[in-house]
A protein has these predicted regions:
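Short, solvent-exposed turn/loop segments enriched in Gly/Ser/Thr/Pro and often Arg
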Residues: 12-20, 195-197, 276-278
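A short helix-breaking turn/cap at a secondary-structure junction
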Residues: 82-172, 176, 350, 355-367
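Short helix-loop capping/hinge segments that flank enzyme active sites or metal/cofactor-binding pockets
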Residues: 143-158, 206-263, 275-280, 284, ...
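Small-aliphatic-rich amphipathic alpha-helix that forms the alpha element of a beta-alpha
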Residues: 263-264, 297-321
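Short, surface-exposed loop/helix-turn segments at secondary-structure junctions
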Residues: 131-134, 202, 250, 282-304
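Acyltransferase
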Residues: 2, 139-140, 166-193, 216-224, ...
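Short, well-ordered beta-strand elements within core beta-sheets of diverse protein domains
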Residues: 102-109, 237-243, 335-336
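Short glycine/serine-rich loop segments
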Residues: 2-124, 311-332
Length: 367
């Protein structure tokens, strides 16, 4: 990014270890939403989302494991792209083969700016052998964003047949946004993946806990630092340390089976859509939503389950502004593409942006 001419003006706030979809920590406190300071900015790139939405920055970079780019984008009415596995070098870390959940990506108020930042992020890095040589950054500027989408088929996943609880108004706001895809020539059909979605969730939390424990077990094992860890970090690490090798392998098999199911859907559909967040921005004083749509959340991150399908399959997913609920709070929509179709996702996002105009709604804090 520096080689591409980026000017870094500062660091933005994140939660401890990037865990959780609400940006707060004991050092800087909570980051407040760009459209309502009494509400959460999302997380973990909550500071970045607010900075972009409030015109402090044209673009910001971040990473996304469980919606860390997508949730703040949805909460602050901007765009955030979770890139395909290997598109953008992320790290390096001491383990470069096994962990393929967290990826780096851009955030911006429009798709041309998003593509410009991605053009200097993407490419091969010899320190990370699973990055792509064919994704050299210039490709995202050489190809035009404008594209004819007439005849394209889109699958609308919605709330996955009722599996995902949603706050009243979220699903309705996202459903209303579908007309903008139809306006650019796409056909949109409701579809439900033939998969045990609870099994996918269980596999996800095992693989996530395994990865979190692998990266942070040293802090847990050290008595001097264990007491400083927030409860969610302790929970993740303890779960990860208790997993057997076969449990991790079985979870990886479930992940692979889920990818194949989505690959089958992409034989019928060019893109998939679903909400980027199951709730509107919530009270900034909360640690996380403990109930959504009348259902109790059994983990600190269950309310973010909508971002898991794309992560589990390693697919590109763009969080796009979907409009505003009755209370004036933003909602977000995910545009999910096939493996390595990052450019196609940006092109559809650009067409949607031009048709909808949602991202051009400014925060009332800007006057």
């Amino acid at each position: 990014m520096r080689a591409g001419g980026a000017l870094f003006v500062g660091r933005t706030n994140t939660p401890e270890f990037g865990l959780g979809g609400h940006t707060y920590n004991p050092v800087y406190g909570a980051t407040r939403n760009a459209f309502d300071p009494a509400r959460s900015a999302g997380g973990s790139s909550g500071g970045a989302g607010v900075a972009v939405a409030l015109r402090m920055l044209p673009v910001a970079d971040g990473s996304d494991m469980m919606g860390s780019l997508r949730t703040p984008a949805a909460f602050n009415n901007v765009y955030g792209l979770r890139t395909s596995i290997g598109c953008v070098p992320h790290g390096p870390t001491e383990e470069v083969f096994f962990q393929q959940f967290s990826v780096a990506g851009p955030m911006a108020r429009n798709i041309p700016d998003l593509a410009m930042l991605l053009s200097v992020q993407a490419g091969f890095d010899a320190r990370l052998p699973l990055t792509h040589r064919h994704a050299e950054g210039g490709d995202f500027l050489k190809q035009p964003l404008a594209r004819d989408f007439r005849g394209m088929r889109i699958g609308w996943l919605g709330d996955l047949g009722g599996h995902l609880p949603t706050e009243p108004g979220v699903l309705e706001t996202c459903t209303q946004a579908l007309r903008h895809f139809e306006a650019v020539g796409c056909t949109v059909d409701a579809v439900l993946p033939p998969f045990d979605l609870e099994q996918m969730w269980r596999a996800w939390i095992d693989l996530r806990s395994f990865a979190v424990a692998g990266a942070n077990a040293g802090l847990y094992r050290d008595a001097a630092t264990r007491g400083l860890l927030k409860p969610e970090a302790v929970w993740e690490i303890e779960r990860g340390l208790q997993l057997s090798a076969m449990q991790v392998y079985d979870a990886a098999r479930t992940r692979s089976a889920w990818y194949q199911v989505l690959r089958g859907l992409f034989a019928r559909y060019d893109f998939l859509l679903m909400p980027a967040a199951q709730v509107f921005p919530f009270d900034v004083a909360l640690d996380w939503p403990h109930e959504v749509g009348g259902r109790a959340m059994d983990t600190y991150h269950r309310w973010m389950q909508a971002v898991v399908p794309a992560t589990m399959a390693g697919l590109p997913a763009l969080a796009a502004p979907a409009g505003f609920g009755a209370g004036g709070l933003p909602a977000g929509l995910q545009i999910i593409g096939p493996a390595q179709a990052d450019m196609a996702v940006l092109q559809l996002g650009h067409a949607y942006d031009q048709a909808s105009g949602h991202a051009r709604v400014r925060s009332p804090l800007l006057g």
